Amino acid sequence: MRDECLRIPHPSSLIPQKMSRGKRFSSMMRGSIGGMRRVAGYATNKVRARRVRKREERSRELTRVNGARRVVITGIGAITCLGLSLQETWDAMVAGKSGIGPVTRFDASHLPVRIAGEIKGFDASKYIDQKELRRTARVSHVAVAAAQEAYLASGLEIGKDVQHDRVGVVMGTAMGGFEMSESALADLRIGPRKMNPFALPAALPNAPGHHISKVCGAKGVLSTVVAACASGTQSIGDAAEMIRRGKADAMFAGGVEAVINESALAGFALMRVLSTNNENPEGAQRPFDITRNGFVYSEGCVVMMLESLEVARGRGAHIYAEVLGLGVSSDAYHIAIPDPTGSGAVRAMQWAIEDAGVRPEDVDYVNAHGSATETNDPLETKAIKLVFGERAYDIPVSSTKSMTGHAMGASGSIEALATVMSLKTGILTPTINLNTPDPECDLDYVPNVARKDDIQVAVSNSFGLGGQNASIVLARYEE
């Protein structure tokens, strides 16, 4: 099955460096003393006791504070409007580049919004054969491509390092294969026989997870998170929980969105949440700026390979970061407007920190939801202050969406990528286009230029339509 995931060369820049394996504990046997056979049983018991103590020490070393298994990230794959790999995406983030431009997928000249964060130069045929291409939606093509990169980068061999049924998939999406449903409806108007018989299954939200599972031979847990803009974040946290609880040893996890079409763009425009700065696409997404006027709709996918620390260490895997905890809450307020008190966002962050077994004072970076809407940015700022108190002013906060736009169900996983790489490299990605700060948004948003900072523990936020809130705590991996 692994061969099916090796159809394209792995980018040299992403080949993981092998880490030296830790020294294994060796048992120390003592002989009988002075031929005193009568104490042999006692000596044997002492040896057994030492072995038990060593096993217990090793178990504690590989266990989180709350008694569950530790979960680490060993591979990351990315297809975004910034690039077609982890390295391309990360380099663009550090450089503060925008992935926003004019819509090219269709003629948007009649719409009030004509800009988006499109994936550029993606060739699905490199990852999926022609027969499957006709039967699947673009969202699945992008997901499979990102999953293959994550799998290759991890160095994991399913079927050798872990059994097929101990590897699962949790993918998040908001829109799924929405465009396939539209295409089927258009064909139906011509005649029922014109419809693609695979259109409906291709449009299902769980289709991306299915195709990752099929291509990579992951026969364990298969789950799909449909939680609007919080989908990608929650999927990573849910996958980590499966490993912690012993339901899996490794998981593919992430978020995907690949629906930039006429109805999606028109629909969000009617909600008045999109930026109409068509003349300046790269400067259109302006989180925390007083001149912000909405987000830019975009697409993308990030998939991460999660493993139990025991499995990752056992095979000498390269480790990017550790997943510590997840917090999920509901505003129970309005499907399209966040609770003005910010209480839902506060609960998500607090519960994530509690689940991680750390304290608020341990957190030294926040990757914000930062959607650049009129209501979200001051509310998120308020929520961060409520969670961290006066210390909030000392914590750097940045919005990846300033560069990527809002990729809906994929946004959380893209921002998790940024957070993981910030933890690993000590470089914080900037909030670009922040030139005139909103007085209500008065935190340190890492404006316009990346910054070096030796962070250890970070929170990444995703707050979505339907009052869906998800926060995840990630940490630098320490031996």
Where are the model-predicted features located?
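ACP-dependent fatty acid/polyketide chain-elongation machinery
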Residues: 39-43, 47-48, 55-132, 154, ...
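Condensing-enzyme catalytic core mediating Claisen C-C bond formation in acyl metabolism
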Residues: 70-74, 101, 279-356, 365, ...
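Compositionally biased, intrinsically disordered low-complexity segments enriched in Pro/Arg/Gln/His
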Residues: 9-16
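Phosphate/pyrophosphate-binding loops at sites that engage ATP/ADP/AMP, CoA/4′-phosphopantetheine
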Residues: 150-163, 311-319, 349-365, 387, ...
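Active-site-proximal alpha-helical scaffold in enzymes
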Residues: 143-156, 205-209, 213-257, 295-317, ...
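Active-site-adjacent elements of ketosynthase-type condensing enzymes
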Residues: 108, 112-118, 176-180, 258-285, ...
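Glycine-/small-residue-rich "gating" segment that lines the acyl/pantetheine channel
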Residues: 190-196, 234-237, 241, 250, ...
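Conserved beta-ketoacyl condensing-enzyme motif
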Residues: 73, 94-227, 256-265, 360-376
